[in-house]
Amino acid sequence: MNVNELRSRAASQEQDPCTLSNYRGFEVVQSSLDLNVSFEKKNVSGTVTYELKNLKSTTEVVLDTSFLDIEQAFVDEKAVDFKLEARKEPFGSPLVIKLANVVEKLKISIKFATTENCSALQFIDKEATDSKVCDYLFSQCQAIHARSLFPCFDTPAVKSPYSFHVKSPSYTLMSGRPVECSEENTYRFEQPIPIPSYLVAIASGNLAGAPIGPRSTVYTEPPNLKACQWEFEKDMENFLVVAEDLIYKYEWLKYDALILPSSFPYGGMENPNITFATPTLISKDRSQVKVMAHELAHSWSGNLVTNCTWEHFWLNEGWTVYLERRILGGVASYEAKQRGEKDYVDAGEKVRHFAAILGWNDLVDTVKTIPSQYTRLVWDLKTVTPDDAFSKIPYEKGFSFLFYLETVLGGTDEFDPFMKHYFKKYRYKSLDSYQFIDTLYEFFEPKGKKDVLDSVDWNTWLYGEGVPPFTPKYDTRLADECYHLRDKWAAYEQNKGQFSASDIEHFEVNQHLLFLGTLTELFSNKKPAPEVYEELRKVYHQYSEASNCEIIASWNDLLLKSENFKPSDKIVQNFATWLGTVGRMKFARPGYKLLKDYVDKDLAIATFRKFESRYHPICKAMVRKDLGLDS
């Protein structure tokens, strides 16, 4: 496929293969959800209403559903017949509503209820919550799970404003702006900014909030509130200010966060107005607050400007990682300036480049471990779901693409005006990779940079497998200490007796992760004697005592890949127990693979069986595949 042949299109011609709906036939003017949460039945029921414009004189409305009970359908408030077609794996069951009259404007309503097979929801019994006061519910609709919560055009190509009305016995949050409501156990929200279905979110439980900035509140269960507030209150407003300077004003008004129970499968989910986040961020050292910078960046990349299909997911995540690192660098620069450092801009760039080095290492590792077809920037998802293809590729290869473009186009001074132009041009819209490239030409050609863009190997970047066709030149000053210590361990025989806990005492968290990650890679290529691993454990005992999940995961990855441990060993048992406390797939999936591949497959399966009920449906399904339990 030639990328240049697909450029110069006002609207994307990409057909989303992950939806069974006829979304191209309609414009959604307004969406409304009227919901009822039942903790007794463990379901959500209600009515969804769409105000539509018929764009092509279409004679039927086809919506996505997955394991939903459909009770009734209405067209312009009149009950009509509907057909729920046979399930078409893995994308669900199309709901077909025939239109007796073809009119330009119409209103469709569907009464529905979720079932026990709903992949978007997790109900948690109160005994399993931290406060043990009441049951808990939360949703995760990305990528194509909204269709299991309510009938919808479940594609990022379709965006509309939403109104939410919810009845629940417990405090409820949704992805909109709260509206005052006097009805008991009733909550209302408005989302005036058009969003796709995957950004619809709900959480209900024993929740309390505390300020973490002038326009930000953190919510969580009351026993955890003070810890969550401390973790984020230092940085949240700084992140917002730097992001606004980079792009343009934050227009969602409030940026709030909900710290969920441990079964939440992701680091964070960028639900508008209320980021859902994992409790693994509460590390008591503010080292994981970078995830909040990432989710905040989604307020522009992903939420305002959206990939039109999941095949172009890198447009969401590559841009977001790029912005995240610019935000982290900007905050570091600001703090250096406050300390009176003269070269404060350089201080910020060091931080940005160090984060990029970690990302590049993750990218190289990921390429080695996933099917090659998923290492492309633009995926083919005709027969698989986005969850099957999900990895760090769209994040880190996408970032590398943007960093490469920044580099060849003349650095941030040249790239930043384009960035602002891009996010203004596609605000409230969805686009594909070819429109992105066309916008580069539109912006830079008048500036005399057409030859630079013509020299880019677009086809290899978008469709090539493996690592990118580009070796980045990052500032390695913060990384060099880590590399030096790694190299010292590589020459263990010459340096025996020269290691001590003080080697790593001054490291910040990301330096620990780089040291452990590069040492793991080194030892994977040339495995040292068991004595080396014993010395590591003895000298760097602080790693064994860590409470930071990133360090726990990296440390165990290093040790267990030695294949020196049996299932009965304490280190293995401790790691297996820890897996039962983390539902975040970043840790759960590689953790179970680690047990399976380097310790004992039966232990991995037994551990998963033991903790399976604690995990979110998405995590549970992916770990089952990883362990070969679905074959």
Swiss-Prot record:
Q: Does the keyword Acetylation apply?
A: no
What are the entry keywords? Cytoplasm, Hydrolase, Metal-binding, Metalloprotease, Nucleus, Protease, Zinc
The EC number(s) attached to this protein equal 3.4.11.-, 3.3.2.10
**MF (Gene Ontology):** aminopeptidase activity; epoxide hydrolase activity; metallopeptidase activity; zinc ion binding
Predominant cellular place of this UniProt entry's protein: cytoplasm
- Cofactor(s), by name: Zn(2+)
What InterPro entries does the database record attribute to this sequence? Aminopeptidase_N-like_N, Aminopeptidase_N-like_N_sf, ARM-type_fold, LTA4H, LTA4H_cat, M1_LTA-4_hydro/amino_C_sf, M1_LTA4H, Peptidase_M1
Tell me which residues this entry annotates as catalytic: E295 (proton acceptor), Y395 (proton donor)
Reactions performed catalytically: an epoxide + H2O = an ethanediol
Q: Where in the cell is it found?
A: Cytoplasm; Nucleus
Give GO BP annotations, semicolon-separated.
peptide catabolic process; proteolysis
Q: Which residues bind Zn(2+)?
A: H294, H298, E317
Q: How is the cofactor bound?
A: Binds 1 zinc ion per subunit.
> What positions does the entry give for substrate binding?
Q140, C141, Q142, P265, Y266, G267, G268, M269, E270
Q: What does this protein do?
A: Aminopeptidase that preferentially cleaves di- and tripeptides. Also has low epoxide hydrolase activity (in vitro). Can hydrolyze the epoxide leukotriene LTA(4) but it forms preferentially 5,6-dihydroxy-7,9,11,14-eicosatetraenoic acid rather than the cytokine leukotriene B(4) as the product compared to the homologous mammalian enzyme (in vitro).
What protein family does this chain belong to?
Answer: Belongs to the peptidase M1 family.
Please give the name of this protein.
Answer: Leucine aminopeptidase 2-2
Organism, scientific name: Meyerozyma guilliermondii (strain ATCC 6260 / CBS 566 / DSM 6381 / JCM 1539 / NBRC 10279 / NRRL Y-324)
